[in-house]
Design a protein with these regions (language model features):
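N-terminal helix-rich structural modules
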Residues: 2-206
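Catalytic Zn2+-binding segment of zinc metalloproteases
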Residues: 388
Length: 388
């Protein structure tokens, strides 16, 4: 069966096997559960707006990941009703959140359509750009003293497109100006309704960061986010840069990376974007904070603790920790290609807020944790401990 000229790669039997046996279902929290019911009316309204923001961001991430993601998803959604074959293809698409992606088990990626493959530079870069040409263009632009343009190309927050015989970088806030404006509007509405003043303040900064081509706004939003320890709701715009394999390729070109360092350009892989929305679970969070207080004692009880250097500082840990009931995961969070994280510690080392005095925030995903096979995990842990 062809969809937009591309044939589904798997047979009906193969698709059924994949969606029934090769995935794990994770049920997120809904409005019928106590955690939601106990929220204030204002926070309930805020949550709805934040979920809307997450849905819009998912389309942004799909665009960044592959140029055919959106059009193929729309076609699958149109054809799926009443068609089990296409419905299973759509399920597989939603599991990996894209037309192709690794499953963490097989050497080759899962590809839903024949002829649609993953790209080294995802859709951050022109899909017909290979590594050699990329390096040649960067060298040419450096020769022409286009240092500022090269710095933008190798930035984490730009989409790169061809412009004649060179490349042009477009900041995310400009490339996705319409989508970011819609997301910012949803966030501002959430800020209006939430009853938590600290959360309200953070949302306002985060909305502004989406509207301005200014990394300083991201820094301010990050700094407000990491301080939140006692809020009722959780909202994160994730910026992870593991998908982009094109930008890091410059590090393998010794002469090129030396030239870049000579003009103070530090290449950073492109950020894949995602949104997490949740309700902070007070009981789970209190337990985490007890662990935090006992951190220095716990590290000495780890297996073979004497064999490695401890990184725990003597002062107060500059980190907030929350256990969260997940309401929505979109974009990069939903690209479960090989697994889905149990917790996330942000910002990452490449983010300016971290070396500008900001701390980190560790968010634990309760529904992901509960979806695991506890007996299997217990056996694995026991076997690991017995080895020591």
């Amino acid at each position: 069966m062809e969809i937009n000229g591309f044939k589904l790669k798997y047979s009906a039997e193969e698709l059924t096997k994949k969606v029934n046996n090769e995935v794990r279902e994770i049920c997120l929290i809904d409005k019928n559960e106590k955690e939601y019911v106990d929220l204030t009316d204002g926070d309930k309204k805020a949550l709805d707006y934040l979920v809307n923001a997450a849905k819009i961001m998912n389309d942004v991430a799909l665009e960044l990941d592959h140029p055919l993601n959106l059009i193929q998803k729309q076609a699958l959604e149109t054809l799926a009703p009443g068609n089990e074959y296409v419905s299973n293809a759509l399920l597989l698409f939603n599991f990996i959140n894209g037309v192709a992606g690794y499953n963490g088990l097989d050497k080759d990626p899962v590809e839903i359509f024949e002829g649609i493959h993953m790209y080294k530079g995802c859709n951050f870069y022109p899909t017909d750009l290979d590594e050699n040409e990329f390096h040649e263009i960067i060298i040419k632009m450096l020769d022409e003293n286009k240092v500022d343009e090269v710095a933008k190309i190798l930035s984490s927050r730009t989409v790169v497109r061809r412009k004649g015989d060179v490349l042009e970088a477009i900041d995310y806030t400009e490339y996705f100006s319409e989508e970011f404006s819609e997301i910012a509007n949803e966030i501002e509405c959430a800020a209006h309704f939430t009853t938590d003043n600290m959360f309200k303040e953070y949302l306002k900064w985060q909305a502004q960061a989406l509207l301005q081509n200014n990394v300083e706004m991201d820094i301010l939003a990050d700094k407000h986010w990491v301080k939140m320890q006692n809020t009722s709701l959780e909202f994160t715009i994730s910026r992870e840069n593991y998908n982009d394999k094109m930008t890091p390729s410059v590090f393998s070109n010794k002469s090129l990376i030396e030239r870049l360092r000579g003009v103070n350009i530090n290449p950073v892989p492109k950020d894949m974007l995602g949104i997490r929305v949740g309700i902070v679970n007070k009981q789970g969070t209190n337990l985490l904070l007890k662990f935090k207080d006992k951190m220095r004692e716990l590290v000495n009880k780890m297996p073979c603790s004497e064999l490695y250097e401890q990184k725990i500082s003597d002062g107060e840990l500059k980190q907030t920790m929350v256990d969260v009931d997940i309401v929505a995961l979109s974009g990069d969070y939903a690209m479960c290609r090989g697994g889905i994280t149990l917790a996330q510690n942000l910002p990452n080392n490449d983010k300016p807020s971290l070396y500008r005095g900001g701390g980190r925030r560790n968010v634990y995903h309760r529904q992901v944790r509960f979806a695991g096979d506890s007996e299997k995990t217990k056996k694995i842990l026991i076997n690991i401990i017995l080895k020591f």
